[in-house]
Amino acid sequence: MQHIALYQPQIAPNTGNIIRLCANTGAVLHLIHPLGFAWDDRRLRRAGLDYAEFADIQHHDDWAAFLKAVAGRNIWALTTKGTRSLYDATIGAEDVLLFGSETAGLPPFIHAELENTQKIRLPMRPTSRSLNLSNAVAVVLYEAIRQNLRAKTAINL
């Protein structure tokens, strides 16, 4: 199954939407702390409805703890600074799709730790800055699922 990682997300409703997405697809959600909201934020619950109980959500105190938890998995960083299109990447069924915060994206130290080939972007108009985080996660996750439909770890669509 796919893994979604959010690095220090800031907006509770986005994370709630992503929880719902992960519950419906079976993707594992990794939340890398600190979060920009309280875990019991009513906006998080409202956006995620009652889906949190059906999602596999893993909390990590920091980047190092996250890396330890996903050791051995390929990490794809979604970034507006990526030189490769999502559609040029071959995403494995157990790979991690990493997204930065809504306000700052991924920090420079993470960019420095990853190879350029691991940094991918969603194609969009040159004058556009970025997509909403929960929308971007949905687009990328379903592309990864599409690429792995025949894998035993893919969800049944």
Residue ranges of model-derived segments:
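Post-transcriptional modification and biogenesis factors for structured RNAs
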Residues: M1-L157
